[in-house]
């Protein structure tokens, strides 16, 4: 369980198994969630990555979020399965990562006893299922019969499927993607432009004149003078 702040919006991280009590210090309990949720005010973001857990504990957390006065944005970055999917339904807006999954199924329990006890357990599970359908119905607007059918089949949904069925509202976008692409494109375009300009400049620039070297083509001056002197005294 973690709590963080992001641009003035409080951020809660619901990461782990949902339980009524914490045994291994990595479970999320209603008491822990309540302490963090009401430690401040304003809009919140709840990141969820949980395989589920106790449906009663999940119901308590779901109710807290539904009753919260601020805006609640749920972001699923990994898995929102079983009881965790119920909590996700409390979001004013539910967003999923492109790689995230959401799973819904029928509630399960362990019962010991005679046939009468088994029948009581079955009746209890039926009522628990109806209560879970309530949360799904409020969020999705799907019929109870369709939701019940999806739960019977243990339905796994990627982001697109969850949006199609109304369990999610959108896909999380990478805020860095557009900026990065712009920078890369600008860099690439600048590099090409600079390369072209360098070529044009190098071709259009006047070539430096080379100094002409005077190479002797005949007799040197000194030799000529010597010859003149020799003739003078003949």
Predicted regions and their residues:
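N-terminal organellar transit peptides
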Residues: 1-83, 91-234
């Amino acid at each position: 369980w973690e709590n963080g702040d992001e641009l003035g919006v409080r951020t809660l991280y619901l990461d782990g198994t949902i339980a009524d009590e914490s045994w291994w210090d990595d479970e999320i309990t209603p008491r822990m969630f309540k302490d963090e949720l009401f430690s401040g005010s304003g809009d919140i973001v709840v990141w969820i990555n949980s395989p589920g857990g106790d449906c009663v504990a999940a119901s308590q957390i779901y109710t807290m979020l539904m009753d919260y006065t601020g805006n609640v944005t749920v972001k699923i970055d990994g898995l929102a399965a079983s009881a965790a999917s119920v909590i996700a339904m409390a979001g004013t807006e539910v967003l999923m990562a492109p790689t995230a999954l959401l799973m819904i199924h029928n509630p399960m329990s362990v019962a010991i006893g005679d046939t009468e006890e088994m029948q009581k357990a079955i009746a209890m599970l039926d009522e628990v299922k109806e209560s879970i359908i309530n949360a799904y119905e409020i969020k999705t607007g799907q019929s109870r019969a369709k939701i019940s059918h999806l739960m019977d089949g243990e339905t796994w949904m990627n982001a697109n499927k969850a949006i199609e069925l109304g369990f999610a509202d959108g896909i999380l976008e990478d805020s860095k993607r557009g900026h990065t692409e712009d920078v890369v494109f600008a860099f690439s375009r600048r590099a090409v432009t600079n390369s072209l300009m360098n070529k044009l400049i190098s071709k259009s620039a006047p070539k430096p004149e080379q100094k002409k070297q005077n190479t002797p083509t005949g007799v040197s001056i000194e030799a000529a003078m010597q010859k003149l002197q020799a003739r003078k005294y003949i």
